[in-house]
């Protein structure tokens, strides 16, 4: 699957990104490189390979679960353009 500049334009528009022509070209190349790598990975024969959750057998030692940050929602929402009932109000992007 290869994207076109029209696809990049649509993605940028939906993401509300304003890209220059050079940025669009660079994004197109990078996205197509990613898709090529994914396609290559999908073609790898994995028959007989046992699925695993983690590449290493050893489990990591985890720290105690304790609060390290305070609730800063009010501070963050104070600078937001619009907040209602502690929710950020954003422009609609997807058509109904």
UniProtKB/Swiss-Prot annotation:
GO biological process, alphabetically ordered: glutaminyl-tRNAGln biosynthesis via transamidation; regulation of translational fidelity; translation
Protein origin, superkingdom: Bacteria
Catalytic activity: L-glutamyl-tRNA(Gln) + L-glutamine + ATP + H2O = L-glutaminyl-tRNA(Gln) + L-glutamate + ADP + phosphate + H(+); L-aspartyl-tRNA(Asn) + L-glutamine + ATP + H2O = L-asparaginyl-tRNA(Asn) + L-glutamate + ADP + phosphate + 2 H(+)
Name this protein carries in UniProt: Glutamyl-tRNA(Gln) amidotransferase subunit C
Catalytic EC class: ligase
PANTHER family: GLUTAMYL-TRNA(GLN) AMIDOTRANSFERASE SUBUNIT C, MITOCHONDRIAL (PTHR15004:SF0)
UniProt keyword Nucleus present: no
Entry's family note: Belongs to the GatC family.
Record keywords, A-Z: ATP-binding, Ligase, Nucleotide-binding, Protein biosynthesis
Entry function: Allows the formation of correctly charged Asn-tRNA(Asn) or Gln-tRNA(Gln) through the transamidation of misacylated Asp-tRNA(Asn) or Glu-tRNA(Gln) in organisms which lack either or both of asparaginyl-tRNA or glutaminyl-tRNA synthetases. The reaction takes place in the presence of glutamine and ATP through an activated phospho-Asp-tRNA(Asn) or phospho-Glu-tRNA(Gln).
EC identifiers of the protein: 6.3.5.-
Subunit record text: Heterotrimer of A, B and C subunits.
Gene Ontology molecular function, alphabetical: asparaginyl-tRNA synthase (glutamine-hydrolyzing) activity; ATP binding; glutaminyl-tRNA synthase (glutamine-hydrolyzing) activity
């Amino acid at each position: 699957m290869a994207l076109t500049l029209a696809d990049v334009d649509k993605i940028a528009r939906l993401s509300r990104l304003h890209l220059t022509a050079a940025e669009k070209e660079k994004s197109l190349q990078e996205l197509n490189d990613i898709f090529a790598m994914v396609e290559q990975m999908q073609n790898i024969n994995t028959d007989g390979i046992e699925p695993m959750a983690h590449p290493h057998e050893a489990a990591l030692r985890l720290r105690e679960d304790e609060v390290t940050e305070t609730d800063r929602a009010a501070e963050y929402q104070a600078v937001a353009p619009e907040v209602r009932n502690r929710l950020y109000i954003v422009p609609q992007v997807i058509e109904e």
